[in-house]
């Protein structure tokens, strides 16, 4: 007995065909909307003032003025927030030795927010009339008259050549001295007047109260700082007179 061929349901065929047509029309409509949106956005970006830069905000800059940073970044050359080259601007600002890191962010529709991270000097490399601000890694931030930044410890330069601003000091003993200063809490570092990197015992400091601090190489610094803080607190609270403090072996 022969099987009868099943005739396709015309309603199903019509439904399938209609669904495909609807899908194609929807896709076409979406493409048109995307293209129209892109065209409108392009027009707004390049041919209107919809994204014109109206405000530039700086944060974190204490030693470099906003005006200096604007000039470094060439901000006057850019008027459009969307097309502004944030990477190039950041790199240009980082050419200033004070500037360690820059983050440039757009805040639509009209604002640029620029966060500055400045280098932090821990000592003043002293050459009598002139001095160099040094970071704890030996980076020379700037050259200043030696009577400025009196809150910073003076680091004896010895026979080490004056550094080039924007480069690092290479002398190992000086680097050890700076590492010690950088590893101290701010409150402890503020008690120091001078530092001698070239003492045979390692970095030795003169406090603002006149006694010496024999610190030694930058090892066990957390423990050394704790011991030193405890001794200085005791000296202050009990009005003791001392000639020196030796924390080379803190235990």
Q: Model-derived features: where do they sit?
A:
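Charged, solvent-exposed interaction patches on well-folded alpha/beta domains
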Residues: 1-54, 67, 71-80, 88-91, ...
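Extended, alpha-helix-rich binding/interface surfaces that flank or overlap catalytic cores
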Residues: 58
């Amino acid at each position: 007995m022969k099987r009868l061929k099943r005739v396709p349901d015309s309603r199903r065929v019509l439904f399938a065909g209609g669904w495909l047509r609807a899908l194609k029309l929807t896709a076409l409509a979406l493409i048109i909307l995307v293209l129209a949106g892109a065209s409108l956005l392009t027009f707004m970006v390049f041919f209107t003032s919809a994204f014109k830069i109206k405000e530039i905000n700086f944060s974190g800059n204490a030693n470099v003025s906003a005006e200096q940073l604007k000039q470094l970044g060439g901000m006057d050359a850019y008027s459009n927030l969307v097309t502004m080259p944030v990477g190039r601007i950041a790199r240009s600002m980082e050419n200033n030795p004070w500037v360690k890191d820059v983050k440039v962010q757009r805040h639509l529709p009209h604002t640029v927010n620029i966060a500055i991270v400045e280098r932090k000097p821990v000592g003043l490399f002293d050459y009598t009339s002139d001095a160099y601000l040094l970071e704890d890694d030996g980076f020379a931030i700037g050259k200043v008259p030696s009577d400025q930044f009196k809150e910073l410890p003076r680091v004896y330069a010895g026979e080490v050549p004056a550094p080039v601003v924007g480069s690092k000091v290479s002398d190992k003993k000086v680097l050890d001295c700076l590492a010690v200063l950088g590893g101290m809490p701010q409150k402890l570092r503020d008690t120091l007047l001078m530092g001698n990197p070239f003492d045979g015992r390692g970095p030795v400091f003169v406090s603002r109260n006149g006694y010496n601090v024999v610190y030694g190489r930058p090892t066990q610094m957390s423990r050394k700082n704790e011991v030193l803080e405890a001794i200085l607190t005791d000296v202050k609270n009990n009005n003791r007179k001392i000639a020196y403090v030796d924390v080379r072996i803190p235990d």
